[in-house]
Structures are given as structure tokens and as C-alpha cells.
Amino acid sequence: MSAFRTHCREIVDEYVQTVLIIDDGAGLKHKVESAEHIDMEDAENATIFDDLDDLDDLDDLDDLEDLEEQEDSEDQEKVTHPLNTLDLTNAFYDLGIVAGLYQPQIEAEQPVDEFAQKIRKVSSTADIIILDWMLTDHDSSYSKAIVKQILDQDKESGGRLRTIVIYTGETSLHDKRDELFEYLDDQSLDNSDDYRISSEHLNIVFYNKEGSNNQLREVAEHELPNKALEEFTLLVDGLVPSFAMKASAAIRYNTGRIITRFGKELDAAYLSHRVLVPDPEDSELFMLENFVSYMRNILAIGRIDNIALGAKSIQNWVNHNFPHLNKKIVHDGNDYTLELEELIKLSQDGFHQNLYQLLDNKKTIIASAFKDASKEASLKAISIYDTQDSTAQESSRQLSILSAFKRTYLDVTDVNEIPYLTQGTLVYSKSDDKFLLCVTPKCDTVRINKSKRFSFAVLDEVNGKKFDMVVPINNAVRVNKKEICENRQEEIISLIIDDRIINGGKTKDYSLYDDLRELEKEEYDDYIYLATSSKFYTLEHIVFECEENKRVLGFKLSSDLIEFWDQDCNEYIWLGDLHDLNTISRVGKLVTNLNRTGVDELEWLRRQYQ
């Protein structure tokens, strides 16, 4: 195991707290019979054997023991592959993990989905699930339904890391894997690896119980917990996921500390604050901000960022991924491939000065282009982290969205999460083909009486030019923009025809052809690149009517489509809400532009400070 994989495993050991074991061979008794009550006074006065003939009762006792042994034997026959529950749970406990145990009691002809639905809630909190393949009468349908219910639950809740270990005595694990893969019928899943079905956040893996005659996949119960944790570690194979898991583990570990810090002795203070402020609902946000601040403090004190993202972790990551990285710096047809130690140093210390000094010694012909790390050459040099499956550019787009947005349309999973119109809300106007950012102060977007005029800054599409925002777009935006583009093409073609008719079959306005060629180049992928206009006069003001809660609430029309409608029934597609500081920065530029003062001064003097 590499140093980086060991680092990830240590974080997994901190994070994983709960495991659910589902097996019909768990060995739990179906029922317990109460012992007959004995009156001790009567027992003392009684004669153990009133008659020697009572010795015959001993034969009855022997018969009873034989009967119990026979029943136990029959129970073992019903369970083809029993589970050594004690060894398995003790092995998890030794690792500090709570192992829950469930032995299904499946009723005759019980519907599969009804049974699986019962498991759904209890399994939702388990990081790892150990599941037997056949839970009754050589029937795998119940286990497959459980897996599907768990996957559906994870999708509906916004996703989570999950490892499911199919632990069975059945042979032909490849066939079992393919059977489950076909049953799940999910295009996001991959079954190309042996004994495995996986996706970005899911790992379903097949192992055999002891005695199954498959030495390659056989794992004893006391060894299974370590195997399960190794499988879970595969889901955390990255710097950023290990950081997120380390932070989550720290919050889990400090849950008691957090709750005691926010104790009931603060109730009176909170209520006092609520009754004293002009708008009582503001007190709820006040407490939320205090809670978030306290959690951030816990993470900072624990140095979670440094441990998971610092120099040592970077060194381990580069060592682990070096064979798969591009490592090549290219400029003007020349290139240089970085050595391992060089890539580690650049990753730890950055490009500034370091990249220029390196190339000045190793590849002088391209070194000068990297002397100023703020120039485009250095920006393109991040391709050293490209792999066969992904690029640093694509990764940077995703991180820029994460750092700019509180949430986007991709993050809304529940009806209670539907957004309302507020400062920082980004929408797309279907009728005007414009991207608009709400800049109305937050306090003016709540407690609305009937209707309110909202102000929006216009964000210009700047594909191929300088941009300050990357925005994910849904299919509704793509379809609308494509329709507008096609309509515009038809208009230009009509203008070209009219131009030639008017000019006797000759073209006079060649700019129309240029416009048509530009429209034909238009492509609509998963992102739009925008630049915020700082011109105050470009602001748009639109009136929206509020709901009963005195806010302008969006309408969810499909899984990825949420819209606002103004008082004239124009549609605005919600794309996301920016982080507060990101919004304030853009509003600040607007205000600065508004406050510009033009001074007519001596040109010689003006050039001294320009």
C-alpha cells in the first residue's frame, strides 16, 4: 500500500463509525421461551424423588435434549452458509466501529419491495453494509432489492460515500455481480472490474465466506472488517475527498462538544435577543452563523486543512499518482517533462520563481515565458496534472463553481430546499436570453407585501474571452439558447436574401455572412462563461410577486429545473446562489462605478499617477 493510500486509510478509520450486517445466518434466536416459575419454599419442602420410579424421568430428559439438538440441526440445514457473528462483530468493535446486526424474518410470499423498504431507513446511516446474497430459500431478489433501495435513498438525499460488501457462500461471484448490475439498470454504474460494481461515490464488492471453495475471494469473518475498510478507502482516493472526510470526521468526533457548547442555558439569551431585534426571524440566522463559526473554529484548531492538504500529503499524492500524470510543460512547440522530485517541489512551493528557475537550468529555450507566473504560459502549465481521464482545466472549472456558489440547481434534492429570490441569486431570462444576478439587499428580499421591484446586474457571455464566473447550465437553458440561435440564423438568412434581391442578385452587406458564421459556431455544453458588468446603467429592474411567506419562492418543474415568474409571467431559470462574499464583491464594483468622479485636470499631472 502506498504512503498516500495509507494516509487515506487512516482518515477512513477516523471517519467510519457504523456498519450494518444483514444476514439470515446471523444465528439470532427466533423466539425465547420463559422458564417456569419455581416457588423456593415449596422446593425446599419437596422430595427430589418421591419414588424410585421417577428415575425414568431422566430418560425423558435425554429425549428432550436429543429433540433440541435435532431442531438446532434442522435450523443449520435451513441456513446453508451461516455467519460467525461473534468473530465479525468483535473484529469491528476492536476497530472502534459499532456493528449493527439484522437477521431478516421474511414472511411467506412477502413482496420484495415491501421488505426492502423496511431496511431503507436503518441502512441510511451505515457507512458500510455487509449483505448476504440469499436471505431466504436460495432467493437473491430480496438482497438485490435492498441494494436498489439504498442507492435510491442516497440519490434522493444528495449522495453519500457508501461501500456494500456482498458476503456470501455462493460460488460464481462474477455471475452474481452481473446479475445485480443488470437488476440495478443504472448507467452511472460500472462493472468492468472483477467482483465489483462501482461509481464515483459507491463501491459494491463481492467476497466469499469461509468454506465456499473459492480461495481467491474467501475472507474469514475476523478479517472482513479490514477488507471492508480497504474497499471504502478506494472512494477517498484524492487530496480533496480526504480533506472533506477528515473535516467530517472531526465534526463527528466533536459532536458532543458542539452540543454542550450550545446548551439550554442559552435559551433565555436567544429568546431575549429575538424579542429585542426589530425583525425576530433575523435571530435564527444569527444563531446559525454562530454555530457555523464554532464548527469552523474546531476545524482550524485541529489543523485539518494542513494535515489533509499540506506538504506531506501533497508529496504522498504525487508519488502515488506520478505514473498517471502528464508531467509535461509545453511552450511554442518545445516541452520539458518533469522528474518526480521536481513535480513534488512545484506542487508544494508553487510556480512563482520556482518554475522559471527550474526551466532556466533544464530547458532555457522556454524559461523566459515562465518568469512572470501571472502570465498565460504559467496558467497553461497546470496541464502537468492532466491524466488520461481528466484535465486540470476541467477540474478547475468544477472547483471554481464550488468556491463561487453556495449551491446550484444540481444540489437541490428536496422540496424544502427550493430557493427564494435574494441577493446573489443567478437566473437566466428565457425571453431576453440574459444571465442576471440579483443585487437587491437581502433585507429587502424578505417580508414583502404583495410585490417588489428587484434589481439585477447583467452578466455578459464571454466564451473565449476573459471571464470571472463559470456557471453550470441545465438542459432547459441549452434548449432555449439553441432555439434563439436557430431563430436568429433564419432572420439573418432572410436579411441576406433581401439584400441580394435589392441589389440585383449581388451581396452588399457582407457582415451578415460574418454574423451567420459566428452563430453556426455556437456550442452549448455544460458550462457558460460570464463576466459581470460593472456599469450601473445596465441594471435591470423586474417586479416579482410574493407568496404567503412574504418571499419570492421558486417553482420546481423537474429534477433540474426551478423557475421564477415575474408579474408579467416571464420565465427566469434559477441556476444557483452565490456565496455572500462573492456577491458583495460584485456589488462593490457596481457601487464604485457609480461613485466615479470625472475631474478635468492637467494631462501632464494625470500621467504621473496613471
Kindly label every feature range from the protein language model.
Residues 1-347, 435, 443-610:
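Extended charged low-complexity segments that act as oligomerization/scaffolding linkers
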Residues 331-403:
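Charged, compositionally biased non-catalytic regions
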